[in-house]
């Protein structure tokens, strides 16, 4: 793998994180019983003398970062369990961006979300992309991919089936390839349809 044109090998997940690669997994590392700001800083809390938490500063930073990315969570003191699925995803993504992600790998960020919540997440993905962060969006939804993507790669059983920039692929072609491509055509022929 090349990082800034330099061949790089990672020996642990920490190595990739230190390089600026962040992953937001489908099953979020969000603690429902903690506030939004506590989740935002979880494991990387700002502390003062004698280890005291700098609560006020962390709340302010969290609120500012969410606002800068176009996300409206009026009260960062609210427990994360009270947020919608889309808002929870956005908090996890904003956290990765704030802590220096240059490459953001998102694993099915809209999988269990409705249309409105998916829109919240996709707007945030577009904002991260527009800030110069490389985004790898893993999804089974061609419509979501096409809304925010500028390059598409489709893998089937670990093999690359498609690798094209957006200008070379229509939404219909992307949908067809993601749905099985040639296999669907063979099945259609076999079934006489």
Where are these regions (language model features)?
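Glycine-rich phosphate-binding loops of nucleotide-dependent enzymes
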Residues: 1-193
């Amino acid at each position: 793998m090349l990082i800034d044109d330099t061949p790089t090998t990672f020996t642990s997940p920490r190595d990739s994180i230190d390089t600026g690669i962040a992953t937001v997994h489908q099953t979020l590392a969000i603690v429902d019983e903690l506030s939004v700001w506590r989740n935002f800083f979880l494991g990387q809390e700002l502390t003062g003398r004698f280890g005291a938490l700098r609560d006020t500063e962390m709340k302010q930073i969290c609120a500012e970062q969410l606002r800068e990315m176009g996300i409206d969570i009026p009260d960062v003191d609210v427990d994360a369990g009270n947020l919608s699925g889309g808002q929870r995803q956005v908090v996890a993504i904003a956290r990765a961006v704030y802590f220096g992600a240059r490459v953001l790998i998102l694993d099915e960020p809209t999988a269990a979300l409705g249309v409105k919540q998916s829109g919240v997440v996709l707007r945030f993905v577009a904002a991260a992309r527009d800030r110069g962060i490389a985004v790898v969006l893993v999804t089974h939804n061609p419509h979501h991919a096409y809304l925010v993507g500028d390059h598409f790669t489709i893998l089937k059983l670990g093999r690359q089936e498609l690798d094209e920039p957006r200008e070379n692929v229509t939404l219909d072609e992307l949908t067809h390839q993601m749905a099985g491509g040639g296999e669907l055509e063979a099945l259609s022929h076999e079934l006489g349809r």
